[in-house]
Amino acid sequence: MLYPTEFDVIVVGGGHAGTEAALASARMGAKTLLLTHNIETLGQMSCNPSIGGIGKGHLVKEVDALGGAMAAATDEAGIQFRILNSSKGPAVRATRAQADRILYKAAIRRRLENQPNLWLFQQAVDDLMVEGDCVVGAVTQIGIRFRARAVVLTAGTFLDGKIHVGLNNYTGGRAGDPAAVSLSARLKELKLPQGRLKTGTPPRIDGRTIDFSKLEEQPGDLDPIPVFSFLGRAEQHPQQLPCWVTHTNERTHDIIRGGLDRSPMYTGVIEGVGPRYCPSIEDKIHRFASKESHQIFLEPEGLTTNEFYPNGISTSLPFDVQLELVHSMRGLEQAHILRPGYAIEYDYFDPRALKASLETKAINGLFFAGQINGTTGYEEAAAQGLLAGVNAGRYVQEKDAWCPRRDQAYLGVLVDDLVTRGVAEPYRMFTSRAEYRLSLREDNADMRLTEIGRELGLVDDVRWDAFCRKRDAVSRETERLKTTWVTPKTLPPEEATALLGKPIDHEYSLAELLRRPGVDYDGVCGLKGGECGPAEPLADDPVLLAQIKEQVEIGIKYQGYIERQATEIERNDANENTRLPDGIDYREVRGLSFEVSQKLNQFRPETIGQASRISGVTPAAISLLMVHLKRRGLGRRNGAAAPAAEQGDGAVPTQQ
């Protein structure tokens, strides 16, 4: 039957990508339908019970700055919070949280059920409705046809998923859930380029059978307890719990080696490529044969369960081998396994067949987000989901897509890497992937993106008001520190010595003092008995106050580096966003090698910047391409055709 209501946007899948996509398009005013095979699993953490980490935490902060749900849900569900790399520079500091699975899922579902313009429906999707080169809806397992002008597909590991435990395997999207076999077959009919990838998960352990007296305790940060959302408060966190650490040993490694003849990875049963940066335990033992031990983190799954997640022993070995290797580790000698570990193979589609908006090049109105694009991780999925939801909403509103740049957001780095370079293995985010990471810090994600989010319709009044207060306070306080001066006469020598190691010998601004190594904001403001501090409190709220002080201190201390990076960005921007015509035939570009013209015709980059990052496309080739465009007057700056109503102060960067 044809469902009587027509929607603007349909989102297929209720994982981390799907939920953010549905919430984003609905916040923008698009009439949105979220189709999921099971409403009870919306927002489910299918693998590890944690959010964030190096690079990943940056993505979560960006999703939050754009009004997304992941950070806020983590603040409500997080049972341990830590700042990683806290002793290093601000560019690589990252927030990570252990989350209670049940509380997290409940927090996400509550937001979905209370979001205006969003409807939920429980049915697996078997088919897409395509007319010509446009998607027009989706068909469910029982034949219900839903019409919409845009569809966002976030199928996770469900597309033709196959689960492996030893040499036994069966179809499934994850343990306990069916695979999307029909939908996968339909996508293959559409001639979209695809491949197979693999990921895995460890056996889960009953905490009542763990001997914690033999383990090393790993508490979270308690003074202060971090928060994830820019609007988060530590008071939102539930009870905090420690993690625990054990190690593999030589006996563990011998057990694993002895089971490799029954490993689906090492017997050729699994064809998909696994994640390099989250390898299975058998892969670790094989690749790092000289290493005598590997650290294993025992992470609590929640406050109302005894289940523990042993982070570091993802495996698809037979269950008898899993049992033996778990029992070989200190503290786990009597451990009871609640669920076996397994590997899952699934279809993904080459992201080079996508535009930077995450819309497919072949089918108008069809967007992909999450693991279907070859990524791994909740955070990467959520970020893509939000972007796909935004651009699906703008597509039906007949507005240009929003495509964040590499110098603007980790989300821009993520998508640009995917659509220009593709993936040979599951892609995960690291700070090292961002060439402008000093400007793309966790602490300034809101400064970079919240104004854009407001313009897009993603940011509500509460977030906007908090952001404006923070932005204005940072600006005022930075200016005050730059224009407040102390001299050898006005600054007592003993105070200068206590803070700086010696008295000052000439006039300094407070900002100049703050730039010195080992000097912090509070130290500078405490000079002259506190007279060097602001006349009025920067904020009444302690969390907001801490954010303001952090922004001011980083902005002043790293001003020179940040300005140099801004100059580099401006220099590179000259050609980065020059658009390439849709119908250009690169064989006609004089001087291009056959290999380069073939690659450009195959991958169809949208901008000069994207073309320059395709493997094998040299700087010389880019120069030839620029000459070709100038001769024919074909190139135009990104966003040049944006409607006049969308230009001006705070205008959203656009891309067709």
Curated annotation (Swiss-Prot):
Keywords: Cytoplasm, FAD, Flavoprotein, NAD, tRNA processing
Residues holding FAD: G13, G14, G15, H16, A17, G18
Keyword NAD: yes
GO-annotated cellular components: cytosol
Chief place of localization: cytoplasm
Cofactor(s) this protein requires: FAD
Residues bound to NAD(+): 274-288
GO biological process assignments: tRNA methylation; tRNA wobble uridine modification
Keyword tRNA processing: yes
Gene3D superfamilies per UniProt: FAD/NAD(P)-binding domain (3.50.50.60), GidA associated domain, C-terminal subdomain (1.10.150.570), tRNA uridine 5-carboxymethylaminomethyl modification enzyme MnmG/GidA (1.10.10.1800)
Cell compartment(s), UniProt: Cytoplasm
GO-annotated molecular function: flavin adenine dinucleotide binding
InterPro entries named in the record: FAD/NAD-bd_sf, GIDA_C_N, MnmG, MnmG-rel, MnmG-rel_CS, MnmG_C, MnmG_C_subdom, MnmG_C_subdom_sf
HAMAP family named in the record: MnmG_GidA
Reported function: NAD-binding protein involved in the addition of a carboxymethylaminomethyl (cmnm) group at the wobble position (U34) of certain tRNAs, forming tRNA-cmnm(5)s(2)U34.
Record-stated family: Belongs to the MnmG family.
Quaternary state and interactors: Homodimer. Heterotetramer of two MnmE and two MnmG subunits.
Protein's recorded name: tRNA uridine 5-carboxymethylaminomethyl modification enzyme MnmG
Organism in which the protein naturally occurs: Burkholderia multivorans (strain ATCC 17616 / 249)
Taxonomic lineage of the native organism: Bacteria, Pseudomonadati, Pseudomonadota, Betaproteobacteria, Burkholderiales
Gene this chain is encoded by: mnmG
